[in-house]
Amino acid sequence: MSTEEYPFVFQLVSVISGRLLPSTPFISVLSASLPPGSMTGAPKKRSCELLRHIEGSNAPRGLYSGVIGYFDVGGGADFSVVIRSAFRWRSEGFWRNGAGGAITALSKVDEEWEEMRAKREAVLQVLQGGSSLP
C-alpha cells in the first residue's frame, strides 16, 4: 500500500495480486471483490447489508463505486475503482458527481461529511471551469 498526495486529498493505493485455479473465471473474482471495502467500510459484509437497507436493493449506484479496467490476454488485469468522478448522461442533462468514503464504528458524522466534501471539490472545480486536472 502506498499514499499519493493530491491538492485536496491523500489517496491510499493498493496493488492486489494472487493466483487463481485454472478453472476460476476472472469475472467471478472481480464480481466477488465488489464493491471494494474502501467504498463500503468495515466489516464489509455488514456494511453492504446496511447499504442495501438504506439505499434500497433496487437502487443501483451505476458506475460509481464500480471499476474501470481490463483483463489482458496474458491473464493479467488492471482495474481502478470509480470514486471521485463525474458523469453526464444525455437523457438527464446534468452532471452527477460521485464522492464518498468508508464508514467505520469510529466514524464521526461531521468529519465524514467534510471529508466527502473535500473529495468532491477537485471534480467540482474542473466542472465549473476553475481548475484543470493535474
Residue ranges and their predicted role:
Residues 1-6:
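Short acidic, Gly/Ser-rich segments with clustered Asp/Glu that frequently serve as metal-coordination loops
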Residues 7-134:
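Conserved hydrophobic core element of enzyme catalytic domains
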